[in-house]
Design a protein with these regions (language model features):
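N-terminal auxiliary segments of SAM/dcSAM-dependent transferases
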Residues: 1-19
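Conserved SAM-binding loop and adjacent beta-strand
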Residues: 11, 29-48, 53
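Conserved SAM/SAH cofactor-binding pocket of Class I
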Residues: 45-118, 124-127, 132-134
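Conserved hydrophobic residues forming the short capping helix/wall of the S-adenosyl-L-methionine
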Residues: 97, 157, 184
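Mobile active-site "lid"/loop adjacent to the S-adenosyl-L-methionine
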Residues: 127-152
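A short glycine-rich, Lys/Arg-flanked "PGG" loop and its adjoining helix->strand segment in the class I
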Residues: 147-163
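Conserved beta-strand signature within the Rossmann-like core of class I S-adenosyl-L-methionine
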Residues: 164-171
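Class I S-adenosyl-L-methionine
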Residues: 173-180, 184-221
């Protein structure tokens, strides 16, 4: 992903840009991840558009960036809390919420992952994480690098979901997918691939994550029956 960015798309990064992505008008601040330059965001937006969601469902969008995922799901009738560790991204997302007249349905908070919503639970959590391990060197770096981000996401997810809640997670072969799945499994979640897109040198996925007792009860019954044979 990074190589494609450097070779073909870097000229549109680092500038104040007005875009319309999947019909949603956006302003992209210079130091904020541009959702139109990489496939992870469109893939995640496609999964969001296909969701069956009750009006008024509570949704958390982690690492919101421009706020496009939060806006997309708010347009489906959800009430959304969006968080980002970057002060500039928070300003950008709040601007886009205003542009789309969604102040009554989307609030944007500054903080790392679940920290701004410590005791709150949601019907759906959305996360398009940074794929590379390490400490960001600048605000723009938070879109690319994070310290144990996926591990901390897996640990924090359970306490922030309602009993039948779920998560949508965008991941790539740029990370160790087996480690990601293992981390979620160790924290009581099973993953199901719902989107997949190949690009040269990389495959991007969207996983649906649900508590194991919901996703796996049918599998557990089948295993028990097989053991009795």
């Amino acid at each position: 992903m990074w190589l494609l960015f450097v070779l073909f798309r870097g000229r549109r990064h680092g500038r104040l840009i007005f875009e319309r992505i999947r019909g949603i008008p956006l302003v992209v601040f210079p130091e904020v991840f541009h959702p139109g330059l990489f496939l992870s965001t469109p893939l995640l937006l496609g999964a969001i558009e296909d969701l069956e969601l009750e009006t008024g469902s509570l949704v958390l969008d982690l690492g919101t960036g421009t706020g496009i995922c939060a806006i997309s799901i708010a347009l489906k009738g959800a009430r959304v809390t969006a968080t980002d560790i970057s002060t500039i991204a928070v300003r950008c997302a709040r601007t886009n919420v205003l542009i789309n007249n969604l102040e009554d349905r989307v609030r944007v908070l500054e903080g790392d992952l679940f920290q701004p919503v410590e005791k709150q639970r949601f019907d759906l959590v959305i996360f398009n994480p940074p794929y590379y391990e390490g400490k960001p060197g600048e605000w723009a770096g938070y879109a690319w690098r994070g310290e144990n981000v996926l591990h901390r996401f897996a640990e924090g997810l359970g306490p922030h979901l309602t009993p039948k809640g779920r998560a949508l997670l965008s991941v790539s072969t740029e990370v160790d997918l087996l480690t990601v799945k293992k981390g979620l499994q160790e924290n009581g979640f099973e993953t199901r691939e719902i989107r997949k897109r190949w690009i040269p040198g990389e495959t991007i996925y969207v996983y649906e994550c649900r508590p194991s007792q919901i996703c796996g009860h049918v599998r557990g019954e089948a295993t028990s029956e097989a053991g009795q044979e």
